């Protein structure tokens, strides 16, 4: 996180992503003076729970590292070096008017109206040249703001640095654990919760695993500055039919044309 300003982490369930982020936030506050750190989660209670974890860490670090605290409550911690950590739910007004040095967005794929929130928050982020952003989440459908940022980071079209934590990266998880987990749930649930796989939000006639197995043929050329891909040239005097599946406009899925 130190080497990159914008960071996004796709991690499987129960991989320690939140607690690891809490440790980094505490370190950042202790060793950087006059910084404002904001923890925003899909629910205010979740953000406050993360702040309580930071408080517990603070109580258990070596005494010579423990800073003085000017204020400590359920919603914020203010240190003697004038750095502070705030916790709140993700809303358009969460950090409006604040000069934020480090913004942490937890389980961002589960935030309702995430695109609207991100649009209103980005000016606060971009106003500071050194403002850091850390976004973490498990996969939760296709087309939401987290999915868009992640895909952009992987493809190298935005400023985010992508990090991925898979189930086999977690100590104690092996093939036997995988088989037992699938037996207790399902392959689809395992892929979503532990496989870092993005599935559509609704049930489909053909299951998502089969659809994801298909691969498009290579396109032959691009038009419209690369936004339009051409796979085959139209054949003269042939009739063509287009089927359209429109999205509901909730930022959860794409409109598709076949």
Sequence positions of predicted segments:
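Metal-dependent catalytic core segments for phosphate chemistry
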Residues: 236-239, 244-258
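ATPase catalytic-site recognition across NTP-hydrolyzing enzymes
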Residues: 167-244
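ASCE P-loop NTPase helicase motor core
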Residues: 56-60, 65, 102, 110-185
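Catalytic acidic motif of RecA-like/P-loop NTPases
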Residues: 14, 109-112, 248
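Conserved Walker A/P-loop ATP-binding site and its immediately adjacent core
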Residues: 35-56
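Walker A/P-loop
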Residues: 4-25
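Inter-Walker segment of RecA-like/P-loop motor cores
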Residues: 49-101
